[in-house]
Curated annotation (Swiss-Prot):
The keyword DNA-binding applies. Residues 54-71 have a biased composition (Acidic residues). Its main location: nucleus. PANTHER family: BASIC HELIX-LOOP-HELIX PROTEIN NEUROGENIN-RELATED, NEUROGENIC DIFFERENTIATION FACTOR 6. It comes from Mus musculus. Keywords: Activator, Developmental protein, Differentiation, DNA-binding, Neurogenesis, Nucleus, Transcription, Transcription regulation. The gene is Neurod6. GO terms for cellular component: nucleus. Residues 28-80 are annotated as: Disordered. This is Neurogenic differentiation factor 6. The keyword Nucleus applies. Efficient DNA binding requires dimerization with another bHLH protein.
Amino acid sequence: MLTLPFDESVVMPESQMCRKFARQCEDQKQIKKPESFPKQVVLRGKSIKRAPGEETEKEEEEEDREEEDENGLSRRRGLRKKKTTKLRLERVKFRRQEANARERNRMHGLNDALDNLRKVVPCYSKTQKLSKIETLRLAKNYIWALSEILRIGKRPDLLTFVQNLCKGLSQPTTNLVAGCLQLNARSFLMGQGGEAAHHTRSPYSTFYPPYHSPELATPPGHGTLDNSKSMKPYNYCSAYESFYESTSPECASPQFEGPLSPPPINYNGIFSLKQEETLDYGKNYNYGMHYCAVPPRGPLGQGAMFRLPTDSHFPYDLHLRSQSLTMQDELNAVFHN
């Protein structure tokens, strides 16, 4: 089977008149194209007047495009810094001034609108000026409170109205709003229920126990706190018992009721020592000598009994009263030997 190559001339034969006419039109178009383009460019150049700044920019772009390499091909160039000419610097400066003027006008308009809003909201003061964010928050709360009044159709209570106005506001703004509406700020805080108890409670009440005593009054500087827990007497001698072999059973902090016998001697509030008989002085003097930190030089036993003169100075100006002075000479001999 013979096959012929596909040819448009064979499938669709054209007449001689159409063929000649089409070829003549194509020849005229090819001739007219290069002539029409420069004419349009010339006409555009005559009709449109360009600014000097735009002409310089166009010339710079054309110079960049016309740069060619040695072979005649255009070179690909990356970002390059434009020439800082005097005209370019003036143009940049003019644009910056225009942007600054637009921003200044915008801020002036915003400040004027906020001033008008401050006159409308129920918080106007000649001495104190609300900040921008506080003004916007108060205006939002005011619009919401008025919409709630219109929705319910009843006149609300003054306290609830102020509470709705002051949601999310700072404390100075809240006080200012309450003062403008002739409402005491303290009663406003007390009317908030659980929040009032939280504000009036001292932050130190969780760390320190309440102070209570049946005999002593409340010390100055302490408020009337919860008296359910009474102050317990603490035994301070337990910390010193590890330093001695025999602990003193009488070394304990006294109760606030106080004994009827002669009062005990207080070691500057650390612990107390009651007056004992002459037979028990061995324990107390051994305890007192260790407290004074006076090292004995002689061969003294642990159970040695001696007495101290009243003129010897103990720490914290302690003087033992009503003690016998029968062994004063023996004590002096022990220390000087």
